[in-house]
UniProtKB/Swiss-Prot annotation:
Positions of heme b binding: 87
Protein's name in the database: Hemoglobin subunit alpha-A
GO CC annotation, single: blood microparticle
UniProtKB keywords: Heme, Iron, Metal-binding, Oxygen transport, Transport
Residue spans crossing the bilayer: none
Superkingdom per UniProt: Eukaryota
One MF term in the entry's GO annotations: organic acid binding
Chain sites annotated for binding O2: 58
Amino acid sequence: VLSAADKTNVKSAFSKIGGQADEYGAETLERMFATYPQTKTYFPHFDLGKGSAQVKAHGKKVAAALVEAANAVDDIAGALSKLSDLHAQKLRVDPVNFKLLGQCFLVTVATHNPSLLTPEVHASLDKFLCAVGTVLTAKYR
């Protein structure tokens, strides 16, 4: 559960990430595919090479979902309801992959903004990303 301080940290971090969110989304996917090659199985039709237009386009979608969730941090489930339905009914992505994606996102943020990721902000973003993963897999039953 995100505390009031966590919510403030998440909103503040995403306001600073701002214009780079799409870039970070693509870099996060590239990092995940390189670090956890098993995640590539969900994208058999993609060119997964560095700088791929398909990875950039999907990274933009990932970033948009994270920004939407951050902007609606009091109602992440409501903000991501349609995406949750998609993952539950069609995509069936193994839930562990959301944790892997979250870890890669944190590394990407830390790489570009080392001073932003204080221990408190890191913990808040980690809790937020876990909450996003929980929402995206909540309807898997």
